[in-house]
């Protein structure tokens, strides 16, 4: 699983769930400030990623994730090679 594949999955999920244009979502996009996402949206995204990739995202790490890039970096670094 490449970082780009993780990014595309996160971008597509957010575009669908938050009804925003996928083209507006980049690494520096902030969940609250740019996407008007609340904490529930972020929790739902993280649970989706945990379930999809078979990883755990500790609460203390999740609390630091303010941008799309931060989530993508964490997931990409912790996904086993053959995860899809």
Feature annotation, model-predicted:
Residues 1-41, 47, 51-84:
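Phosphopantetheine-dependent thiolation modules in NRPS/PKS and related acyl-activating systems
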């Amino acid at each position: 699983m490449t970082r780009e594949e993780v990014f595309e999955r996160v971008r597509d999920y957010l575009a669908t769930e938050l009804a925003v244009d996928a083209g507006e979502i980049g690494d520096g996009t902030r969940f609250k400030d740019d996407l008007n996402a609340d904490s529930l949206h972020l929790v739902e995204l993280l649970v989706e990623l945990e379930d999809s990739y078979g990883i755990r995202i500790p609460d203390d790490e999740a609390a630091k994730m303010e941008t799309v890039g931060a989530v993508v970096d964490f997931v990409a670094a912790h996904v086993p090679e053959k995860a899809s």
